[in-house]
Curated annotation (Swiss-Prot):
The gene is rpsP. This is Small ribosomal subunit protein bS16. It comes from Shewanella baltica (strain OS155 / ATCC BAA-1091). GO terms for biological process: translation. Gene3D superfamilies: 3.30.1320.10. The keyword Phosphoprotein does not apply.
């Protein structure tokens, strides 16, 4: 099954997440199909917290990809910010 989920990056105690489309059988930070955005929970000042390519997210969801609970909330927040 194809999922849209967070892949952790960044340094120790400084998380940074790529939002990726991946096969659910692959490791969390392993191989992915496409990177559709990022989430920076510790953004400071003018740094972006969230960037998502909503067109690509819609494409993958229409093709059967399931977003994880956290990513679904981030997608909802991104839609609200652009509207």
């Amino acid at each position: 099954m194809v999922t849209i989920r967070l892949a952790r990056g960044g340094a120790k105690k400084r998380p940074f997440y790529n939002i990726v489309v991946a096969d659910s059988r692959n490791a969390r930070d392993g191989r992915f199909i496409e990177r559709v955005g990022f989430f920076n929970p510790l953004a400071r000042g003018q740094e972006e917290t969230l960037r998502l390519d909503l067109a690509r997210v819609e494409h993958w969801v229409s093709n059967g990809a399931a977003a994880t609970e956290r990513v679904a909330k981030l997608i909802k927040d991104a839609r609200k910010a652009t509207a």
